[in-house]
A protein has these predicted regions:
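Non-heme Fe(II)-dependent double-stranded beta-helix
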Residues: 1-13, 20-134, 140
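Non-heme Fe(II)/2-oxoglutarate
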Residues: 40-52, 60, 64-69, 176-183, ...
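Short, solvent-exposed loop/turn segments at secondary-structure junctions
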Residues: 23-26, 120, 125, 139, ...
Length: 265
């Protein structure tokens, strides 16, 4: 088990760290709620059920894939619901998570966070139009904010085959740009993501860029820097990929200014 000093050193060196921080009982509660929402969607919309509604894995995989094929809005409604549930909010604000994030941001224990980009990704195999290309969220989130990002698999260990997050090794130490960097910076603080297949690096200095998929087990999270280049993994199997994301902003930082990225009233 790494000491706090070693955790900080590794985070600064690599730009990310994988830690065991999630209570798996929380994940099971969310999985059960997800299955409930899926089965209710079938009933409420009079859709023929071809999966086993009494089996969680069948429901969240075959059941969700079929819902998406009937109408993407049915998946979208569930996508919008779960991250605002008390179970999910309890998960992203757990003491185990926030204490480590405070450690990495050099904050006091009583510091508070503003969270955004809180979601549970629900990626369907064979569909890539919702996958993000190479980007850093320093260019796309709150201007000048001091924040750390979280990515974690929900119900299956994350591997290259099932869409684990992909990074450019040591990119937090390189001043890299893509063909979309200027556009991202001009739209800073707004919803602004680039298509997976259209983003290319403009490698002016000729650095050798090496990408890596980060394997993550259930119960683990990736915490990474806002200037680490990353992109969505591609699913190469028949199951859904479910992953949680959240950004943790230090609201005590003088440069923090709230920006309404989502146009909520």
């Amino acid at each position: 088990m790494l000491s706090n000093i070693d955790i900080k050193k590794k985070f600064e060196r690599d730009g990310y760290i994988v830690l065991d921080l999630i209570n798996k009982n929380f994940l099971l509660d969310i999985k059960s709620n997800l299955a409930l929402l899926i089965n209710n969607s079938y009933i409420n919309n009079n859709i023929k059920i071809n999966h086993n509604p009494n089996c969680l894995n069948s429901t969240i995989n075959e059941g969700m894939i079929n819902l998406e094929s009937v109408d993407h809005k049915l998946l979208s409604n569930i996508y919008d619901t779960l991250p605002r549930s008390t179970f999910f909010l309890k998960l992203i604000s757990s003491d185990s998570l926030t204490k480590k994030i405070k450690l990495l941001l050099n904050l006091k224990n009583k510091s508070n966070f503003y969270t955004n980009s809180v979601c549970m990704r629900m990626d369907v195999p064979g569909i890539t139009k919702f996958n993000y290309g190479w980007h850093i969220d320093e260019n796309t989130n709150i201007t000048g904010s001091n924040f750390i990002q979280l990515w974690a698999p929900m119900f299956e260990n994350a591997t290259k085959k099932n869409g684990a997050l992909e990074i450019i090794i040591q990119s937090h130490k390189l001043k890299l740009e893509t063909n979309m960097t200027k556009s991202e910076q001009e739209k800073l603080g707004k919803i602004n993501r680039s298509d997976y297949n259209k983003v290319k690096f403009i490698n002016k200095k000729g650095e050798k860029l090496i990408s890596k998929h980060i394997p993550v087990r259930i119960g683990q999270v990736i915490l990474f820097k806002k200037n680490l280049y990353h992109r969505s993994g591609i699913i190469n199997e028949s199951k859904m990929r479910y992953a949680m994301t959240s950004f943790y902003h230090d609201i005590s930082d003088k440069s923090f200014t709230y920006e309404n990225m989502y146009n909520f009233a």
